[in-house]
Structure formats: C-alpha cells, structure tokens
Design a protein with these regions (language model features):
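Amphipathic alpha-helical hairpins
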Residues: 1-180
C-alpha cells in the first residue's frame, strides 16, 4: 500500500469480509439466546447486516472494483470469543449476557472501521461513498445503543439475579474475607 486510497480499499475489503462473517454468526447466536428480545435483536441485525453488505457492494461498484473481502483476523477473533461463550456458559442468562457483550464488541469494531472509512472517503473526495458509509455508521451506532439498552434493562439483570440466587448461602464467608 502506497497511498491513502490503497489503504481505503484494503480496509473496505476487511469490513466486507467482516460483515459476511457476522451475517453467518448472528443466526447461531439468535438460536442460542434464551431471551426472546435478544434473539430478536440478533435476527433483526442479520437483516440490517445484509443491507450493509449490499451497500458495500454498491461502494465497490462506484470505485470500479470487484466486491471481495480480505481475511479479517480481528472479526474472526471476536466471533471465536462469542462461540466460546456459547459453548462454555452453563447458565442461559449468563450465556445471554456474554453473547450480548460479544455482539457489542463486534459493533464497536464496526463503528471504528466505518468511522475511519467515512473520514478517508471524505478526504479522498468520494462524497457518494462517504454518504453510504455514514448511513451504515449510523445504523451500527443505533444497534449498539439498542444492545446497551437491552443489557441494562434485562439481560445483565437476569444474569446478576442468577448469581445472587446461587451465592445466597455464602454471605458469611464474603463478610469474613472483608474483615481480613
């Protein structure tokens, strides 16, 4: 890569790969979710992500480039983390909290990438491309806010209540540790 344009195109390939990987992972997460609201959020985001993939394909077309991805180790790591949570969490509500956290990590990655791509598109005077990237950026921010609201209003509370129920017989040991 020698120019900002080269870097822009490589990063575009990265996020294209990421979106394609996300659209495959979300249905698995929806299936594992015990919360109907969380499952619905994941399912809704699949549809939104498919629209974002189409928007990226439109951007590649504007640039006169083929729409193709470039392996993205960052998204693979985030998806692997979600997979581990789905396998290892023994409690449904804890699994939901972990999957929601993993989904937000993905959202934050996407927000970072789309924000950077938009800024570069503006610098490169690719106004149509910047507008399309901004549309996706705003969708990602909105999804992150929805996930935060869901975490704070339901998912984390349910997981925390399960912890309290399991740990209720142990308050004397906790108090003894504090005195030391």
């Amino acid at each position: 890569m020698k120019t900002l344009n080269d870097l822009f195109e490589e990063t575009l390939k990265d996020i294209y790969y990421a979106e394609k990987a996300i659209v495959k992972a979300l249905p698995k997460m929806a299936k594992k979710a015990s919360s109907e609201e969380l499952a619905s959020a994941f399912t809704t985001h699949v549809e939104e992500t498919q629209g974002q993939i189409e928007r990226l394909e439109e951007i590649f077309g504007i640039l006169g480039k083929p729409a193709r991805g470039k392996k993205c180790p960052a998204i693979e790591g985030l998806i692997e983390e979600a997979s581990e949570i789905m396998k290892e969490a023994e409690d449904d509500t804890v699994r939901d909290a972990g999957m929601l956290s993993a989904a937000q990590a993905v959202e934050h990655y996407e927000i970072s990438r789309y924000g950077t791509l938009k800024a570069w598109a503006e610098k490169l005077e690719l106004d149509d491309v910047a507008s399309l990237l901004d549309e996706t950026l705003e969708e990602e921010k909105a999804t992150d806010l929805k996930l935060t609201d869901l975490a704070e209003s339901e998912i984390n509370l349910a997981a925390d209540n399960d912890d309290e129920e399991e740990e209720a017989p142990k308050p004397k040991r906790v108090a003894a540790k504090k005195k030391k």
